[in-house]
């Protein structure tokens, strides 16, 4: 009982860290365009993170919990090692202000601990295939949607005074930020649900793998509280270092990224909110001119993405090995 409670607690800590680490993804654009202050923005994002609990299903949770790693090979040590790898990598990247993916840190860590236990036979190829495809697809969807929206908006409002357009989109950006936060909560909180359900299944508290509703509620609560804690280092990178944004651009970026997340969530794929919003911001910036995008900063972010899964994998494998040496199963 204590082990189960402890692992659920660690999973919720990850969910909380995910919230404040990825809060920047939800609010960076609405803060950088000065539509909302950072304080109001995190409250706005946290509220819609939680509302997602009553809006979406649990397809992503099922993929993370049993569709990427053979659930029958999972032990408490595997779960703890996986969470340790994800949490440590998230804290390292948060400290340096790098907007990496908490999602990929989690699945990378989970895989690292499982492989350390039983080898690559523990890996479920189908779940990993669609996840890897979306690593490339989600930023492309975000970028294409952001680019297309910006072109369409410029054409539709080409005869409208810029000051009036700016005023309209300052209001509309509240809606786009809510839409993005809703989808951020839906995809990201479900990953923690999958891990908690794995704990319950391993402990034989549930006979078949499913997501109890109380797990849904505590996961969304944890990510919402984490979002309230914010994460200004990453907000600065996402909201101003990649490209300068106006309310029109903020609206297009948030909406484009939300579309990418919605597609992934409906198909049960655990994707990166960071990838989606970064791709959308790049697409928006490129509509002005290619040089409007600070490609050096974008390149640093891409390198952080590339290292996330192997880094979390390695840390988790090491954590699992230490647990085994100490006698844990």
Region roles according to the model:
Residues 1-329:
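Multi-pass alpha-helical transmembrane bundle typical of ion/small-solute transporters
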